[in-house]
Amino acid sequence: MGARVKVVSEIEKIMRNIDQIRNIGIIAHVDHGKTTTSDSLLAAAGIISERIAGEALVLDYLNVEKQRGITVKSANVSLYHEYEGKPYVINLIDTPGHVDFSGKVTRSLRVLDGAIVVVDAVEGVMTQTETVIRQALEERVRPILFINKVDRLIKELKLPPEKIQQRFVEIIKEVNNLIDLYAEPEFRKKWKLDPNAGMVAFGSAKDKWGISVPQVKKKGITFREIIQAYEKGKEAVAELSKKMPLHETLLDMVIKFVPNPREAQRYRIPKIWKGDINSEIGQAMLNADPDGPLVFFINDVRIEKAGLVATGRVFSGTLRSGEEVYLLNAGKKSRLLQVSIYMGPFREVTKEIPAGNIGAVMGFEDVRAGETVVSLGYEENAAPFESLRYVSEPVVTIAVEPVKIQDLPKMIEALRKLTIEDPNLVVKINEETGEYLLSGMGPLHLEIALTMLREKFGVEVKASPPIVVYRETVRQQSRVFEGKSPNKHNKLYISVEPLNEETITLIQNGAVTEDQDPKDRARILADKAGWDYNEARKIWAIDENINVFVDKTAGVQYLREVKDTIIAGFRLALKEGPLAAEPVRGVKVVLHDAVIHEDPVHRGPGQLYPAVRNAIWAGILDGRPTLLEPLQKLDIRAPMEYLSNITAVLTRKRGRIINVETTGVMARIIAAIPVAESFDLAGELRSATAGRAFWGVEFYGWAPVPDQMLQDLIAKIRQRKGLPPSPPKIDDLIGP
């Protein structure tokens, strides 16, 4: 304990000096050794004893992770390191590497300035590595590389020194290609990995040694010596970790190549914050000014016994306990009750945290990850950090019910808390059946959520088999339909058509949003998606499933007064479409004309909602409607001789092969496969390749369900939801 107490006061002192702070994360494909690497760093910072570093897996402090051996929650730790005689504080934010949790990865990247990319020397760059490098570069986070598990090249593959070096060159080249592909021009050259400059480390996190090219020269070590150490056995390998400790190599590299927070914020803020850079707040963030107005971005929220703990980065100003602040997304005031810094999974209370640092706060009641907190008085002119875009969308649903009926209130509360901790989980109640539906990014994501319900919240639940979430859409423009209100006093004339891919992509990437300036938005849509500029200016709403509402009317009386009601009706109508009560995606709803009653009593939601819904639904049914199913992208690597077996499995599961590459004896297959077919995929691939294939999955997109399956699928979904077997007819919706 002594060392740690000493470190808190030391750390508080250094936190004031921004040149001596670094904010980094470790990103990697699942099982490439990210947590073990974090452990070696923790051991070195004196928070855990060195002896247990490899086994302790301190960052994996939830039991779930121990059993599965994969990290689920991003935790933060402050490390202490001396470099060239100067003390530094390094905030290390742990990020999950498993595809199902990529929402958390995106969120942690926003608070980092640099990332150690960990790559398994044998497996090389995998899909997930590629995804996280791309995301890091999009957030202007500088990557440095650690090639891990070099012991596998020596022990399993028994490669000679020159072959080992050749493997390193291949991996560095692959990562540099990604930097070429995804980095913005101004960073491309500077951030390219140069091993001779020391931007790449090689080693084994499990055996706690690591080395870089400059160190090889300085310490006069050769790879032949490292190979010999493994031939000699445990003690010789332990010597390696004394001679060239991994933490020293990695943390030296971090201090040398990752910018300090002020330097990083100068080029990162214009990219990740969409407010006015010339405003007082904008300037304070560019300069990471501890005396400026407070801006604190929350990237992680946990529920603990004492309440909600919100972790994030102070971009400007200083977090002080007891101060009153404003939450931009929630739109309300709150008080900072307790401010603390992290050490391992533990927090140490401190009085204040200046700009550039990562800290944790208690006292916010219903804060969500992605919130921006500012000083009181600045709520009017401070923009929130971008509404976070996640790479995946929830695509699999299970129905959950408590084993003991009296646990229902407890389960409902636990589900509410789970969705606060993980915004990628969505909870809905099926009004008809009273079921609680939990949707997530994949079977594993939901499995972990169920385990959390049991272990963290103590609720025993039964879950239905996983159900795939579909979307409804149209394939052609519909006719114009008249939607009448029940009292016949209001009429809306509406048609529905598909949005083009360009528009969908712009909305998905956050380039086009609902709260944008209409002129800017219209310009982007006209330039990049072929919209008519005047029509694009008349967009009223864009909902979360990428549907757009356009008002093409001219001079309709009382329309302004009911605009909000019509928009709410549009959102409701598309939450559950007419085919199978699934969310509608990718449609443009156009209002051509309307007759609105002059008396507000006769034009309330009860009258307008049905009119909007019936006209939109009729339009959908008239526009060659279909269901879209979610696809997963698979990245499979296996020995060449299993290629035909793998292809057979994929074809049987309606998979589509996108690309096949072969290097030496290995084949890499990139394919897209419907999520509906992927539940037993792991088992089938294992048996088809005698367990020698490894693969990654990520969300790929939506595609129309094959026509021959459509009617059957609609009937099945409707039956499951307790709806009449066939969808409504147009005449049922807009009768005479």
From Swiss-Prot:
This is Elongation factor 2. Catalyzes the GTP-dependent ribosomal translocation step during translation elongation. During this step, the ribosome changes from the pre-translocational (PRE) to the post-translocational (POST) state as the newly formed A-site-bound peptidyl-tRNA and P-site-bound deacylated tRNA move to the P and E sites, respectively. Catalyzes the coordinated movement of the two tRNA molecules, the mRNA and conformational changes in the ribosome. Belongs to the TRAFAC class translation factor GTPase superfamily. Classic translation factor GTPase family. EF-G/EF-2 subfamily. Residues 19-262 form the tr-type G domain. The modification Diphthamide is found at H602. NCBIfam families: aEF-2, small_GTP. GTP binds at residues 28-35, 94-98, 148-151. InterPro entries: EFG_II (IPR041095), EFG_III/V (IPR035647), EFG_V-like (IPR000640), EFTu-like_2 (IPR004161), G_TR_CS (IPR031157), P-loop_NTPase (IPR027417), Ribosomal_Su5_D2-typ_SF (IPR020568), Ribsml_uS5_D2-typ_fold_subgr (IPR014721). SUPFAM superfamilies: EF-G C-terminal domain-like, P-loop containing nucleoside triphosphate hydrolases, Ribosomal protein S5 domain 2-like, Translation proteins. Its main location: cytoplasm. PANTHER family: ELONGATION FACTOR-LIKE GTPASE 1 (PTHR42908:SF3), TRANSLATION ELONGATION FACTOR-RELATED (PTHR42908). SMART domains: EFG_C, EFG_IV. One of its GO terms (cellular component) is cytosol. It is found in: Cytoplasm. Keywords: Cytoplasm, Elongation factor, GTP-binding, Nucleotide-binding, Protein biosynthesis. GO terms for molecular function: GTP binding; GTPase activity; translation elongation factor activity. It comes from Aeropyrum pernix (strain ATCC 700893 / DSM 11879 / JCM 9820 / NBRC 100138 / K1). HAMAP family: EF_G_EF_2_A.
